[in-house]
Curated annotation (Swiss-Prot):
Positions where N6-acetyllysine occurs in the chain: K3, K30, K43, K90, K114, K141
Underlying gene: Hmgb2
Classification via SUPFAM superfamilies: HMG-box
Protein's name in the database: High mobility group protein B2
Tissue expression pattern: Widely expressed in embryo. In adult mainly expressed in lymphoid organs and testes. Expressed in primary spermatocytes. Expressed in the superficial zone of articular cartilage.
Chain's role: Multifunctional protein with various roles in different cellular compartments. May act in a redox sensitive manner. In the nucleus is an abundant chromatin-associated non-histone protein involved in transcription, chromatin remodeling and V(D)J recombination and probably other processes. Binds DNA with a preference to non-canonical DNA structures such as single-stranded DNA.
Feature: compositional bias, Acidic residues: 187-210
Disulfide bonds: C23-C45
């Protein structure tokens, strides 16, 4: 999918997200020219939040309640656009295409970015993640690449078993097309099926990111 619906209400923020936003504003006022070390900043915010009293947290909880009320009110009046993607139905039992190393990295780091930049758009979040990934050293990327390789290996085994099962079931149902052309066309059909699966899964991954 491309960009999400611009008319969709902005998501509600938690009390902690409001607290982090306040911390960022304070930091910008004190150090307008310095850049923020994301990992250190997140750690300091988390530690500070844990030591705060219930009374200190209450103002952020009030902000979160107000924002939730705003979100619920806007969602009642929100009408999602009609005629969204209507593809063919996918077999829910089909193995899901494995994520890439970059996708695993994004899944891990996206929540942190949302906390630090609560108002950031989907496109800007993706851009930020891309920049963070490119700054990672080969050593830092290695755990994600190893995990992705294992998931890919498992997927290849699962999809082979799934297709073998599908063929045996199709055989039981009887001839669905002229037998003379079956062997010749099978490899091409498999490639077409795989391409369709990949395209649909790519779209699903983009939806998940939204």
């Amino acid at each position: 999918m491309g960009k999400g619906d611009p008319n969709k209400p902005r998501g509600k923020m938690s009390s902690y997200a409001f607290f982090v936003q306040t911390c960022r504003e304070e930091h910008k006022k004190k150090h307008p020219d310095s850049s923020v070390n994301f990992a250190e900043f997140s750690k300091k915010c988390s530690e500070r939040w844990k030591t705060m009293s219930a009374k200190e947290k209450s103002k952020f909880e009030d902000l979160a309640k107000s924002d939730k009320a705003r979100y619920d009110r806007e969602m009642k009046n929100y009408v999602p656009p009609k005629g969204d993607k209507k593809g063919k139905k996918k077999d829910p039992n089909a193995p899901k295409r494995p994520p890439s190393a970059f996708f695993l990295f994004c899944s891990e780091n996206r929540p942190k970015i949302k906390i630090e930049h609560p108002g950031l758009s989907i496109g800007d979040t993706a851009k930020k993640l891309g920049e963070m990934w490119s700054e990672q050293s080969a050593k830092d990327k290695q755990p994600y690449e190893q995990k992705a390789a294992k998931l890919k290996e498992k997927y290849e085994k699962d999809i082979a078993a799934y297709r073998a099962k599908g063929k045996s079931e199709a055989g039981k149902k009887g001839p669905g097309r002229p037998t003379g052309s079956k062997k010749k066309n099978e490899p091409e059909d498999e490639e077409e099926e795989e391409e369709e699966e990949e395209e649909e899964d790519d779209e699903e991954e983009e939806e998940d990111e939204e």
